[in-house]
Amino acid sequence: MVRNILLIEFPWGRDKDPRVPLGHASILAMLRAMPEIQCQSFVKPINAPDFQLDDVKKEILSKLSKLGENTDIAIGVYVWCEDVIKSILASLRSNNFKGRIILGGPQISYSGSGLERIYPEADIFVRGYGEFALAELLTKSGKISHTGVHFAGDYDLELQTVVDLDLCPSPWLEGVINLENQPFVRWETQRGCQFNCGFCQHKEAGARLPKHKFHFNRIEKEIDLFC
């Protein structure tokens, strides 16, 4: 049975950036490569002049109604959109959304236990990189045993996901991000950082891990695409 997923993100937009954020695009590339998953994307910069919360709620509900049953939602939670997401989650449940609500992103990855108290409407939390965790959640029924995935109500191990970067499809090579008329790109050749600087939230939470580099063959192909 095909499972539907609406992947949602509210980035802080910059004029130079591609319309689809790189992290969001990487997850899209993974999910769209799987025939048993029907994935739709919803990206709306929270600082866009036309951003209206009530309109966004209506648009999300409209997309969900078209996707029909057997649909989940996955949302990346950032500090600048946390209040908006909390309001959307409450709206989803008050409008009788029955699917699973999956939350990831920095506000989840860098948080300790007690996520259920902060986001009571959510069912599942993913700490760390989301590609493989989401893919497994959407292709297997019931609860899964995946490092970094926490189900609401269960004991929280507060672990991060583990990702084999060589198995992640490239959002650039898969055409998830449109390069046309795009003079600036955000390009990922590695993930992680071996340092643990106190001022930086973008270290790997809970661990000092070595850098993980993408396979050079992928990097070469992306260079050819950009050039």
Regions found by a protein language model. Give the residues of each.
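N-terminal [4Fe-4S]-dependent radical SAM core
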Residues: 2-6, 12-13, 143-189
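Conserved SAM/AdoMet-binding glycine-rich loop
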Residues: 3-14, 72-74, 98, 102, ...
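A short, glycine/small-residue-rich beta-strand->loop->alpha-helix junction that serves as a flexible
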Residues: 12-22, 77-82
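Radical SAM [4Fe-4S] cluster-binding motif and immediate context
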Residues: 19, 169-227
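Non-membrane alpha-helical structural segments and their capping/turn regions in soluble enzymes
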Residues: 21, 82, 86, 131, ...
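Short catalytic helix/loop segments, enriched in acidic residues and glycine
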Residues: 21-32
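Generic structural signal for small/hydrophobic residues in well-ordered secondary structure
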Residues: 31, 105, 123, 149, ...
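Glycine-rich beta-alpha loop elements in corrinoid/cobalamin-binding modules
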Residues: 40-159
